[in-house]
Amino acid sequence: MTELSYEDVTPIARLNFDPAAIPDRGDAPWETLEDFPAASRAKPGDVKMGNSGPGSIWHLAHAALEDKVGVKFNPIPFGGAAPAVLALLGGHVDAVAVSPDEVAIHGSSGKLKTLAVMADRRLKGFEKVPTLKERGIDLSIGTWRGIAAPKATPPDVIAVLTEATRKSADEAVLKDALDRLSMGHAYADAATFRDTMKRDNEVFRQLVGKLGLKA
């Protein structure tokens, strides 16, 4: 397998940002984000938090939250976000770290409630859900989708791709689709996109090291 770094590509633009969400059951004993880590501090290791598998983005989000609030949850890995959410619905774990779109339907039914999202601002469709930053926790983590080209791509080709992507990102049909899927329309130009890649690379490198994960 070829190793690939963000430095090996030329960023064109980021199209969205899909932050981590922290949902628990609708009948869970904690009502706010502050209640959740407090329960773990009271009984270390008792609070079971599901994730989508070792080294996955939602596992890293889970670990980043632990690091920021100074608690240790009992991590329960699953083979993806969907089985983690099913385990939460079944009462087998106390909370999960997943994307908002994976729990939106269960939130509207009242089966689950989302305590917070790891984003810079509140999400469309989740307007009542606070961000971690609103709660004094400086953490914004999730996944994103964007356009990049091979590093040796000629500048004139990059210019064409940049303009086409900018126009496409401004189309109502794309914005509506991302909002409908709770996937957070968040266009960013090439410079901002590269900064995001660089920041995430460093954050994830540190988390992977702390977790002792190896390829």
Task: Report each predicted region and the residues it spans.
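Conserved hydrophobic/amphipathic secondary-structure segments
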Residues: 1-147
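Glycine-/small-residue-rich active-site loops that bind phosphorylated ligands and cofactors
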Residues: 28, 57, 153-154, 185
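Soluble non-cytosolic domains of exported or imported proteins
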Residues: 56, 82, 90, 97, ...
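An extracytoplasmic/periplasmic, membrane-proximal ligand-sensing/linker region
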Residues: 67-71, 155-215
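A broadly tuned preference for mixed-charge, low-complexity surface segments
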Residues: 78, 100-109, 150-153, 171, ...
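A short beta-strand structural signal in non-transmembrane regions
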Residues: 144-150, 158, 162
